[in-house]
């Protein structure tokens, strides 16, 4: 279930809140949970016009989500690789961004094993657990809600 967030400012790094942009986090996470290609495509369109400081992580995650919805195996793999390159590039540029690491954890937990994209789960889980209390409240709520159905996150939150 998606939380009813309003549009919020998402810092590009936890330590540098001056570098931020507006993204409709509620719509983004709703599309991430959805099986609707229409919702996912709408988010991809929105993200394509977002500023570069957050665009690649969110766009990469959404493209990987699209890969999981449908199509032939070759096109799904191509989309997944394209999204992975964007997300991993964003994390490499901003490794202290807990939300980027959360996006990767969501994808890695739910990606088919055959893709071999599971190697950062422990590291990301530990980083998210360590950073959780300093994150914006609406992001904490999003993560806590995901934690309820996650088999790997294991946050101790009420």
Annotated model-derived regions:
Residues 30-44, 75-84, 117-118:
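Helix-turn-helix repeat elements of alpha-solenoid scaffolds
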Residues 31-33, 65-74, 110-115:
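Short coil/turn linking the two alpha-helices of tandem helical-hairpin repeats
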Residues 55-56, 100:
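TPR alpha-solenoid repeat register
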Residues 78-85, 115-134:
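TPR/TPR-like (Sel1-like) alpha-helical repeat modules
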